[in-house]
Amino acid sequence: MKKFTIRFIGALIPLYVLVLFYIFYISPNLSGDLGNIGQIPFGKDYSNAIGKNYLLRSRVIQFTDKNMNSRYKIGTIGDSFSQQGINGYQNYLANLENTDILNFKWEINCGAPQTAINLLNSGVFSNSYFKVVIIECVERQLIYRLSTVNFGNKSFKDSTVNEHKQIDKENYKPFLENVFSWIRLSCGYNNPVNKVQLDANYFDSPTYGNKLFFYEYDLSFKTIDKNDITIAKSNLTKIVRLFESKGIKLIFMIAADKYDVYQSFIIHNPYPKNRTLDYFKDFEAYPYFVNSKQILYPLVRNGVKDVYLMNDSHWSYKASQVVAKELKKRIYILSNTK
């Protein structure tokens, strides 16, 4: 029995070592959504350095029942690219326009385009004055979100509380589960974060400057159905017309995937080329349509570092600034168009 106990304890020593390594090195150095999703210890220095450039306060107001009847010049509806707080494009736009912006959380399992239709049909927009409403949708979900819009849906509920509960539930995992996830992901098994080599340093990081980390779902374009593309484009036109019929100017912005923006700079790229945004070229002549890749790709090509965050799937404050300037131009054009 004693020998068995000694052998059992001995067998657990490697696990103890791994747990201690995770506690004292891996966990404290997780940063960015890609770092947390992929259990990659990027460290905190990069995020801390980037954070020193953020605006000091946010002028983005979250929609609640209490401010339903308030008047705002600009309203925004979007996914995680529209929930970036002080470093988000809305905050820079708010400062350029010198006005607060009202942001609507997208409904769980709904998406920004459908949430926008729900708000329009339920009369929420009729209670608030908007000069313009901006709908933002990330590229990897663009076709699905647009092609599945139900234009007859009138239900809307503020999803902020439920959303936070869902996020808390997803973020909370038993400690050992995190350890085993790190071991599994470190072995490359079913890792949702991909890594490729770039032809130059596109990020201000001594360790990962020439590496591109991106979300596996950035490759979801490989399964796009052509019929869904046709429906998506038709629905986008219909959404714009519906807002116009209510007297509301609309801007539809696509938040380009990180992989799409950097794919031309990957050495020996093992993945196919993403051409999703090519399907929407016929919309580029319209002032209501904003393809953020056209704004951000030239920055990367000209050597601007950290257009997107090295350790995150989202763009940085640098991109937010440039996107905000473009949105300001579009708002001016639309405001002077009958």
How should each PLM-predicted stretch be described?
Residues M1-K338:
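Extracellular glycan-modifying ectodomains
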